[in-house]
């Protein structure tokens, strides 16, 4: 039997590290992104694996920049040929995992916590992490009038996106490292941890109902635009200042039956990341344009610019940090120790990277045997 805390985690941790800035979902899974993919299909192209379409999911967050840019610039469609790239946008991890399990999407960009939770709940049968996408982009932003140093966080009200999500677990772990005590489930203790949806966190900050927030981008930069101060960048707590914020997952069934299609999507991802690195300003504009297309609202420059700078695009899933994030959840009492063996299958990604003369990546011993 799962413990009460584990049940709470299954509702919370799957909400994902990259929770929504924008309200995108219009149905139970997400909303179809507006696109003109048919117009981008090259004449004479052939279908991959005989598929009419490949269904790709992602969040309307800058931490999903690879998917945003690849959609906007047509990289997915280019690699899929006459197989149509179809898109769904999501605003929470559980709905994307549900969509993957039901076949509503085949491949998705998602945070580490829902990937861990989806994998463990299915006893390792529903998904594989097949690549990385982004690192960083998480900050502790506070009201500088109330909090002037890290020790001042004690006794204050600090928001995280959701019980058991990646930022929530990271903040609880940081609190414990300070020697302070907080009940993980209630959020009560030496610090009041206030679980607040990212959509309303800026308003909660403006109203004074919270004193700060441990949140991903671009929510962090929205708080700064409202007068907040970055007190801590989570990247400073990790070796080499790198930790996974977004991974690429695939249905195990789809991976087994359509490896060529999966390889095509991974090739598009690698090519997109290369283009982003070479053209950061154009890529930033492309990501924002896709956000606007998906949601009807682009980010203002005072939010977009600092948020973009704090996110590192990467092909590496940073597997060792996923294991550490799971250990933090166990330490907080929000997760029973998971068996993550087999959560990664980086075979196709490393094939693509080798063909592109790029460095291959490691699964930290958590790959398919």
Where are these regions (language model features)?
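Short, glycine-/small- and polar/acidic-enriched structural segments
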Residues: 34-194, 211-214
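Conserved C-terminal helix/tail region of periplasmic/extracytoplasmic solute-binding proteins
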Residues: 327-369
């Amino acid at each position: 039997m799962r413990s009460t805390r584990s049940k709470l985690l299954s509702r919370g941790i799957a909400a994902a590290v990259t929770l929504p800035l924008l309200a995108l979902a219009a149905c139970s899974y997400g909303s179809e992104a507006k696109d003109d993919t048919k117009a981008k299909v090259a004449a004479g192209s052939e279908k991959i694996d005989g598929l009419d379409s490949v269904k790709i999911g992602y969040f309307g967050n800058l931490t999903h920049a690879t998917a945003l840019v690849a959609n906007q610039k047509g990289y997915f469609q280019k690699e899929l040929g006459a197989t149509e790239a179809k898109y769904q946008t999501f605003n929470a991890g559980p709905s994307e995992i549900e969509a993957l399990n039901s076949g509503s999407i085949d491949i998705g960009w998602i945070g580490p916590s829902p990937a861990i939770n989806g994998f463990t709940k299915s006893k390792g049968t529903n998904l594989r992490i097949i690549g990385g996408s982004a690192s960083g982009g998480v900050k502790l932003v506070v009201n500088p009038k109330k909090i002037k140093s890290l020790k001042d966080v004690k006794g204050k009200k600090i928001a995280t996106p959701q019980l058991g999500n990646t930022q929530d677990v990271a903040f609880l772990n940081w609190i414990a490292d300070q020697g302070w005590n907080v009940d993980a489930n209630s959020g009560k203790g030496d610090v009041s941890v206030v679980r607040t949806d990212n959509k309303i966190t800026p308003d909660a900050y403006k109203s004074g109902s919270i004193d700060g927030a441990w949140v991903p981008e671009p929510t962090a930069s929205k708080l700064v635009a409202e007068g907040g101060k970055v007190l801590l960048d989570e990247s400073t707590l990790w070796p080499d200042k790198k930790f996974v914020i977004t991974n690429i997952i695939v249905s195990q069934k789809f991976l087994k039956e359509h490896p060529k299609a999966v390889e095509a999507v991974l090739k598009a991802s690698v090519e997109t990341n290369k283009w982003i690195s070479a053209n950061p300003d154009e890529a930033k504009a492309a990501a924002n344009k896709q956000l606007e297309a998906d949601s009807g609202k682009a980010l203002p420059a005072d939010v977009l610019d600092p948020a973009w700078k704090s996110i590192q695009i990467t092909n590496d899933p940073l597997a060792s940090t996923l294991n550490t994030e799971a250990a933090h959840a166990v330490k907080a009492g929000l997760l029973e120790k998971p068996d993550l063996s087999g959560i990664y299958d980086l075979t196709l990604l490393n094939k693509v990277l080798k063909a592109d003369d790029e460095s291959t990546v490691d699964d930290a011993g958590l790959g398919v045997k």
